[in-house]
């Protein structure tokens, strides 16, 4: 399982193939990263065109991915929180069923420790020597006590032995070779392409020739738009940041190639389930924004590719929406492992196999903004943040409500308006759609006890939408 951090899906060739020209090349037609190894996984397996983070920030998204639970039940609703002891990770379930389990790279589920190598709690991964909690430094060195980050190192002094993406890949390959004779699960979490946008030579100059254009969405008037869509600290010149970001993506893809070569060399490539995904996206200047945390697709929509040549059809694109919360129950079902706990996420393993879901299946996912203060319980009453939003997403529509006083509810027709610029909420033609999605949000909030649905403003807007049906 290969997971990146803050990976815009438009940087992967296999996702560009799913998009129309104006959507595929927001930074200009020459602004393309070559990702042949990740694309190979997509062409030999299944690609979900619309997989979403339950909350587009590292810890909450990864917690839901690992546990199959929404934030209310895994108690990780912002960064620097600890995954609930009651949460049974997919790693623990696989370990209990005879798999050798290992975790390599960034965890971000064990509180404030930084970097905190091989934490005492292993989260279901027996080999966690190369697991660390959090941080984005650019050089790793081996010591007698184990790996350590050189926090003062210049990225230009790193190489294929010390740059984190390469280093963690080397450890993953060693894990594969040690356990190739039996069932294993290796979770490899790259800390890139998260900011700061810096990558080692020669990747640091590979894309310097490109003149990145400002995305069209960054040039639009934000008057009347919700607070969560307003710009945030953009540099005047994006060129260097984007060139470095593309370089990080290229470095990741080359290391995915190393992993595929290692699996082939071990004779187990065709019989290994390989998953490529990310915890959340990066706005990359779309809508005049950088980083993540908002419901817009460049922030909340993540790549999700699964390849298993011996056990699934190839070259399949899935248009159904998927949530990272669906991952754990789907993986265990796909591996024929009976769960030992109740999950909030759904079993989508039929889609992984290229089969259809039952007719009664409701094709919808839910997302929410983080809760910005760490508290001992789920009380949000005293926190204030302009981005306290909640969304329902289907393949066709996205409905978002916000606690912020001046924010109007926002409905996007994703098919007609993939740039997410036009609000259809008060358009009479969408009245039935608004009412249905509002009812779905209400049902979700009540079933999973999400307090954001109970906020007076959001509650009133949802009830009003339902009554107008």
Regions found by a protein language model. Name each.
Residues 415:
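Residues forming the ATP-binding cleft of Hanks-type serine/threonine protein kinase domains
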Residues 455-456:
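A short glycine-rich, hydrophobically flanked beta-strand micro-motif that places a catalytic Asp/Glu
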Residues 1-403, 407-410, 418-439, 443-446, ...:
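Formylglycine-dependent sulfatase
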């Amino acid at each position: 399982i290969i997971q990146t951090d803050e990976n815009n899906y438009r940087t992967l060739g296999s996702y560009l193939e799913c998009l129309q020209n104006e959507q595929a090349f927001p930074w200009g037609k020459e602004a393309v990263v070559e990702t042949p190894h990740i694309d190979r996984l997509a062409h030999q397996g299944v690609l979900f065109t619309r997989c979403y983070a339950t909350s587009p920030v590292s810890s909450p998204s990864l917690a839901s991915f690992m546990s199959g639970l929404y934030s209310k039940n895994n108690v990780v609703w912002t960064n620097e929180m600890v995954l609930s002891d009651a949460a049974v990770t997919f790693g623990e379930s696989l370990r209990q069923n005879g798999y050798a389990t290992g975790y390599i790279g960034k965890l971000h589920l064990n509180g404030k420790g930084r970097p905190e190598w091989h934490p005492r709690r292993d989260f279901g991964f027996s080999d966690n020597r190369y697991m660390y909690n959090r941080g984005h430094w650019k050089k790793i060195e081996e010591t007698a006590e184990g790996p350590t980050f050189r926090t003062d190192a210049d990225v230009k002094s790193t190489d294929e032995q010390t740059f984190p993406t390469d280093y963690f890949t080397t450890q993953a390959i060693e894990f594969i070779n040690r356990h190739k004779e039996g069932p294993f699960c290796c979770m490899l979490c790259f800390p890139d392409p998260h900011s700061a946008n810096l990558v080692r030579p020669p990747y640091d100059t590979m894309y310097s020739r490109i003149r990145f254009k400002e995305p069209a969405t960054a040039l639009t008037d934000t008057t009347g738009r919700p607070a969560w869509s307003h710009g945030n600290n953009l540099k005047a010149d994006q060129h260097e940041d984007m060139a470095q970001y593309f370089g990080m993506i290229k470095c990741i893809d080359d290391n995915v190639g190393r992993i595929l070569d290692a699996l082939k060399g071990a004779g187990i490539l065709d019989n290994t389930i390989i998953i490529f995904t990310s915890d959340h996206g990066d706005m990359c200047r779309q809508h005049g924004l950088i980083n993540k945390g908002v419901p817009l697709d460049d922030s909340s929509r993540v790549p999700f590719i699964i390849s298993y040549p011996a056990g699934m059809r190839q070259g399949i694109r899935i248009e159904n929406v998927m949530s990272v919360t669906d991952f754990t129950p789907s993986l265990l079902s796909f591996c024929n492992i009976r769960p030992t706990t109740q999950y909030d996420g759904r079993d989508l393993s039929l889609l992984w196999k290229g089969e259809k879901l039952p007719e009664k299946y409701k094709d919808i996912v839910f997302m929410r903004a983080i809760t910005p203060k760490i508290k001992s319980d789920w009380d949000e009453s005293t926190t204030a943040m302009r981005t306290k939003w909640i969304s329902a997403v289907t393949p066709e529509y996205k409905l978002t409500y916000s606690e912020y006083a001046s924010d109007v509810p926002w409905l996007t027709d994703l098919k007609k308006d993939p740039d997410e610029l036009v609000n259809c909420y008060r358009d009479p033609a969408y009245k039935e759609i608004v009412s249905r999605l509002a009812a779905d949000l209400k049902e979700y909030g009540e079933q999973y006890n999400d307090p954001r649905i109970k906020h007076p403003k959001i509650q009133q807007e949802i009830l009003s939408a339902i009554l107008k049906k």
